[in-house]
Swiss-Prot record:
InterPro entries: aa-tRNA-synth_I_CS (IPR001412), aa-tRNA-synth_Ic (IPR002305), Rossmann-like_a/b/a_fold (IPR014729), Trp-tRNA-ligase (IPR002306), Tryptophan-tRNA-ligase_arc (IPR020653). This is Tryptophan--tRNA ligase. It is found in: Cytoplasm. NCBIfam families: PRK12285.1-4 (NF008927), trpS (TIGR00233). A motif ('HIGH' region) lies at residues 81-89.
């Protein structure tokens, strides 16, 4: 019997049943109808959607129809900055950049240094804020321009958020947040108040533009509890409901359902050097057989293999990915060769990303929302 999985904004444990999780949260499956509507306006479908990394949503169809009527909307996502960024963190951001480019809309990106300070007993506030600035480099490195990307570091850019957060907080009862997030009598009040701030950004574009400006939030599905609450109270506060687009977690190199910051070998970080990347991929769990002879005779299982999972992330060519899949299943492709192919793809991506990341180092303040509003 499979271990029962646990998914909260702060913890993912066990092998996640994504269909069951979607049903538990009450989200909707991403169907061909929504994908076709997206393609109608974007002109194409991003591989992350085409290959099923994004699989559930709330009102994606509604915000696309809103777009079709020529009405304004925005994108919103965020990051809890507690350490360096790994590839799994970047999946929603890559789609975020694509959506911004295709639809020409602004992006609001929240760095929740306060949340990470509240959540981690060992975390100093200054450390969380330092990581917010460091992680911002990874977002900027994706190619955003200051007119399209608005960074919000909670402890530094609170002024435009706080009036909205106050209204949100007044609508949320202790019983509601306790039931939604599993808070207990020992939960500190910072963490109890924090959902008001994450919800507030969903309403911020409407305040700044002075007219209804709903947001679409691409993020991992563990963030759904925040935005369920946001949708519950939005209209009573005079704001449009936020729409969401949910991704699965990126499989850990060790074979678990999700990469873990507590195990550096489970993930590839954007600051890893080539030697480290090579070692991590070489040591990665695979769906291969114990010996090359067995692999050739019986074939491998790419469906449980993080190496194949990463090929799906980093290879934009559907025919190439399909060839890897069938070559593994047939035994024609051995794990060592497959890992070497993946290493070359990731090495190239990380090298280019690191160069862009360093160029962004003295530009963070130009992207911060508060610097544009002052």
């Amino acid at each position: 019997m499979d271990e029962e999985f646990v998914v909260t904004p702060w913890e993912v444990r066990g092998r996640v049943d994504y269909q069951k999780l979607m049903q538990q949260f009450g989200a909707r499956p991403l169907t061909q109808a929504e994908v076709s509507l997206l393609e109608k306006y974007a002109g194409e479908v991003h591989p992350l959607i085409r290959r099923g990394f994004f699989y559930a949503h709330r009102d994606l169809d509604a915000i696309l129809k809103w777009h079709g009527e020529g009405k304004p909307w925005a994108l919103y996502t965020g990051r809890g900055p507690s350490g360096p960024v790994h590839i799994g963190h970047m999946v929603p951001w890559i789609l975020l950049k694509w959506l911004s480019d295709k639809f020409g809309v602004e992006v609001y990106f929240q760095m929740t240094d306060d949340e990470k300070f509240y959540d981690d007993p060992e975390m100093r506030l200054e450390e969380a804020t330092k990581w917010a600035y460091e992680n911002a480099l990874d977002v900027i490195a994706l190619g955003f321009t200051p007119d399209k990307l608005h960074l919000i570091i909670d402890t530094k850019d609170i002024k435009p958020l706080y009036p909205i957060a106050a209204k949100v907080a007044k609508k949320l009862t202790w019983n509601t947040v306790k039931a939604t997030f599993g808070f207990t009598d020992s939960t500190n009040i910072g963490l109890i108040f924090y959902p008001s701030l994450q919800i507030a950004v969903a309403f911020l574009p409407t305040e700044l533009h002075g007219r209804p400006t709903p947001v679409l939030i691409p993020c991992a599905i563990d963030q759904d509890p925040y935005f369920r609450l946001a949708r519950d109270i939005a209209e009573s506060l005079g704001y449009p409901k936020p729409a969401t687009l949910y991704s699965k977690f990126i499989m850990a190199l060790t074979g678990e359902s999700k990469m873990s910051a507590s195990n550096p070998n489970s993930a590839i970080y954007t600051i890893d050097d080539e030697k480290t990347i090579r070692r991590k991929i070489a040591n990665a769990y695979t769906g291969g057989r114990p010996t090359a002879e067995e692999q050739r005779r019986l074939g491998g299982n790419p469906d449980v293999c993080p190496v194949y999972h990463y090929h799906m992330l980093f290879d934009p060519d559907d025919a190439s990915v399909e060839k890897i899949y069938h070559s593994c299943k047939s035994g024609a492709l051995l794990c060592g060769e497959c890992k070497q192919m993946l290493y070359e793809k990731i090495r190239k991506f990380v090298k280019q990303h690191q160069e862009a990341r360093e160029k962004a180092r003295d530009k963070v303040d130009a992207y911060r929302l508060s610097s544009k509003l002052s």
